[in-house]
Amino acid sequence: MVLVAQIIVDVPLMQTDRPYSYLIPEAMQGQIAIGMRVHVPFGKGNRLLQGFVIGLEEQENLRDFPELKPIAELLDYEPVLNQDQLDLADQMRHTVFSYKISILKSMLPGLLNSQYDKVIMATDKLDEEDKQTFLQGQDHVLFSQLSEEQRQAIPRLVQSGRVTVDYLAKDKQNIKTEKHYSVQKGILETLAISQRAKRRLEMRDFLLKKSEPGKVADLHKLFSRDVVKFFIEAGALVITEVEVNRADSYFEKVEKTDFLELNVQQAHAVEEMTRQIGQGGKPFLLEGVTGSGKTEVYLHLIERTLAMGKTAIVLVPEISLTPQMTNRFISRFGDLVAIMHSGLSDGEKFDEWRKVRSGQAKVVVGARSAIFAPLDNIGAIIIDEEHEATYKQESNPRYHARDVALLRAKSHGAVLVLGSATPSIETRARAQKGVYHFLELTRRANPNAKIPQVEVVDFKDFVGRQEASDFTPPLLEKIRERLARKEQVVLMLNRRGYSSFVMCRDCGYVDDCPNCDISLTLHMDTKTMNCHYCDFQKAIPHVCPNCQSRQIRYYGTGTQKAYDQLTELLPEARVIRMDVDTTRKKGAHEKLLEAFGSGKADILLGTQMIAKGLDFPNVTLVGVLNADTSLNLPDFRSAERTFQLLTQVAGRAGRADKEGEVIIQTYNPSHYAIRFAQQQDYEGFYVYEMGIRRQLAYPPYFYTVGITLSHKDEEFVVRKSYEVMAYLREHLSDKVTFLGPTPKPIARTHNLYHYQIIIKYRFEDNLEETLNRVLDMTQEPENKDLRLIIDHEPQNFT
């Protein structure tokens, strides 16, 4: 009997998107399992590639398979993917138009997809003799430092619990350890210490009172390194390296809180959702005005889920994953929570993933990719701010977290909750049709908190009468009132940097990116012009490169420019600027919010990131500096996005006992998105927008697929775009509507030209098969360097 493994190799191509059979060497039999990673020889040159084991089978006779190659190396000693995740990858392939290997890799922390070594760590079950034989007598050793014979013994030691294995990034330490000490009292009591060595005597007395081991770092706070070293060298202290989770210190900072009492609407929502845990069934849309206590509903639902012995996933948009938000979950559920988002280092992400995989964490709170968390027995999946476009991944594999959540909820019989104050039009339409259950929270959780008054200010009324381009007199007056009352202000501008572009007033020259069809953005803090697409950077021009004129002017606005205007107009105000540039450093986001929350600033000025998830009781004024920036994009969702953003940012005002006010500055005060946002009227906006969508045949009345072709040669990409269009017309029904091929709104980035085709359809049986064939066509030799993206239900058309 011969054991054979089915392996998906790490080559994301049409030709390799299938399992390959490999022989399991005798030394690996009994150690290999589905979900592990291996190194296998691949192709004619037997190049070593990583692969995932997705199946195991027994064959009667190897003579029937003489060409089988053996697996070269086992990379894991326990599976990194479970069967649930492997099944999920198979289901996702049908809608994301991606290769299976890309989907599998997206489920793992980045560290496991990079260069790393393994650390073999002894447990207390490993005796001294085996430690000498297999670990060179050390408590932990790098796998790369072991002999071949020692390496072959490791799987057996792992399975018997005598060693554990962790991963070490080649460029960064993956495992964080700290030194702990234990006191050898017998040695300490007989240790000779001079009466003149006062600090040594003090430390001896201190240690004699210690019954528990402690951290060496704590000793260093009390005594000098030389004094501590004396006791270590004398053998009175035994030092051991203890592995720590990098997030532990953060969890220790958060104080435990009690559950709040729910109002009638909140309690009804929790009861309805709880009934469905373990039953599956239709998802819930929880539509609640800003400040209505949706998060408290989530917390109570999770408490019920855990009481049933099940686990939970909470997805939050990356931009909303503030310490304020994560602390609410940690304060209720402590170290049962794992946090997963892009602000963590590779090592921290790995620690949290391992905490989930080991079963220690029962609640995962994270951004989009947390939907893949390797939890077992899921009882609830919650997607907060479900309308956010960031739940759709814009790189391969292009999945929407909501679609993956639907698959996982169905597989586990879990309740799926979609929460928002401003649900996406598609989600609300499904609730209207009865595809989703519909629950509402119509009033703020704090009975003293009122929905803020919203005033719209027309920029056109103040042309030539403004002290600064970004601030109208009514807004400045309201800000001054708040400063006088010692209240706080939040100001939002949907653009980072200084100005949107630089132009010569003599010849009209605009400084563009050489790689992209987009103007460069001025950044005064770095004194550079930057491209936000390809990261090209150059010095700020003081002379026009075209006509050598010095009449260079900065047009548009940005957070940095608004900050400069604000500090000039209101020198007494303490202003915090918060955008991608000021929050780039690790922990900066948290520090800025902490400073504002503790009253160290009067005004918080920022981009979209300040519109979500912030809850500061002293904020009584919110100002939107220009509501038009997202309104004028060439995208059918631009009105919806503007309405959602304005409603969300308005919700930051008056969340406690003080009344809130909102000022929206715009050149388009009569636009329906702004009018409905002023009235905080989601229902009115929904009905109006649905009428437009029906008229123009856009979602939710039709489904859409975006196809983008890219190449460095524009003539070539145009020709290929028309070939793809002809193929689609030939193989799809006449009920399908096609738009294009046309250049994308930004037609060139990274020196590649982009053309797009939009498909609109209601029901189309051949669509999946046809699109997969189009994907395969681009792999043919004559299409070398042609990039093709197939995006099912694209969230952005810009």
Predicted regions: what they are:
Residues 1-364, 371-404, 408-420, 434-446, ...:
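Accessory, non-ATPase domains that flank or precede helicase/AAA+ motor cores in DNA-metabolism machines
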Residues 2-4, 17, 46, 486, ...:
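A general secondary-structure signal for short beta-strands and their flanking turns/coil
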Residues 63-78, 645, 744, 749-762:
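Solvent-exposed, membrane-proximal periplasmic/extracellular interface segments of envelope transport
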Residues 257-263, 267, 279-718, 756-757, ...:
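Inter-lobe coupling/hinge segments of SF2-like helicase ATPases
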Residues 726, 730-750, 775, 788, ...:
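A carboxyl-terminal module marker
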